[in-house]
Amino acid sequence: MAKATSSLVVPIIFLVIFALVEQNTGCFDYDVYQPCDHCRERCLKYYPVTRKAICRKNHCVCIGPCPNDKAIPNVKLFKNVKEQILS
């Protein structure tokens, strides 16, 4: 009986760890079929301004917080869009 109990301890520990630990990674959204021309404008068109546009392997990538992260005020979304596009 003791052997059966001890064989359940390790799986239970892993279940508890996976249930309590939250993965903290940024969200990546790949725009696979389009080259890097005007990557920042494309990211602003589909995602909030908190996303960063970079070019990886000739593909536009928008990196930023996950959608379920803190809410983004609408004022920041539309304020100085021209500056954000040019940056």
UniProtKB/Swiss-Prot annotation:
Keyword list, A-Z: Antimicrobial, Disulfide bond, Fungicide, Plant defense, Secreted, Signal
Q: Which domain of life is it from?
A: Eukaryota
A Gene Ontology biological process annotation? Answer: killing of cells of another organism
For this chain, the annotated S-S bridges are 27-66, 36-55, 39-60, 43-62
Location in the cell = Secreted
Range of residues in the leader sequence: 1-23
Could you give one GO CC term from the UniProt record? extracellular region
Q: What is its main location?
A: secreted
Family, as annotated? Belongs to the DEFL family.
Its recorded name reads: Defensin-like protein 175
